[in-house]
Amino acid sequence: MVAIKIGFVSRHETESVELVRALINHFNSRAEIFVEPGLAEQLGMKGTPVEGMENLGVNFIVSVGGDGTILRTIHRMRNPLPILGINMGTIGFLVDVEPREAVQTIEHLLSGFEVDERTRLKVTLDEKDLIPATNEVTLITASPAKMIDFDVISNGALMERLRADGVIIATSTGSTAYAMSAGGPIVDPRVDAIVLVPMAPFKLSSRPWVVPGDSIVELRLKLPEKEALVVVDGTNVATMTSRDTLVISKAETPARFVKASRDGFYEKVKNKLA
């Protein structure tokens, strides 16, 4: 019987690293283990880059930390492997498993598991591809306390001409992240949609939009002297000028998550936001 292959990534804090050490010790005899280099150095093991785990046939990756750890891991893969998130004290919506449940959960996965695929967003700035977004793409003013003027175009039609601090363009998965904090709707991740949430708009009539998931959304700055920042999943930043067009559409490959929780999405929302 071929052993299952499990990858590990983690925050580099002591508590997270020690949990990974315990999990590896527990499953080392029944699974082939791969550990990302930074974590491997702390554990005194040989490391394998996350992007290399794709080519080695890893079945799933265990991510110990929060949503940020998961998002950074997904960014490093062209065709993301399934990820199991173990929650280290955050209110993340991508981390399903508490540390005390980690061993039992992984035990169940050794005999098989289901994968939940989530749409990502392709992000193109001035015809150059940025990292695909799992949660959201944010266009935000580069100058604090200075609004930007921009057009929002969907499938060639002008949706809005906004004056605002920016706009958040989120997947259904990302609707419970930054977009929700800015007043956007909570969208069931099974819904194929793109959510657009203006940030502190000047017009009171500016409200969030929900458009079909196969839409092509374009953003264009109106004033030549203004610059804006394009932020993907809160970490990757690029600068946009009025000469550029930011184009957002459905990515070719989804993010993938191991189904580990019996609770449905609505139960998760109630528990996380209580």
Predicted regions and their residues:
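Short glycine/serine/threonine-rich phosphate/pyrophosphate-binding segments
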Residues: 16-19, 68-73, 176-181
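N-terminal glycine-rich "phosphate-gripper" loop used for MgATP/nucleotide binding
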Residues: 59, 63-67, 74-77
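Catalytic core of DAGKc-family lipid kinases
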Residues: 91-165
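ATP/nucleoside-binding phosphotransfer catalytic cores, i.e., glycine-rich phosphate-binding loops
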Residues: 131, 139, 144, 154-158, ...
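Gly/Ser/Thr-rich active-site loops/lids in small-molecule metabolic enzymes
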Residues: 161-164, 169-205
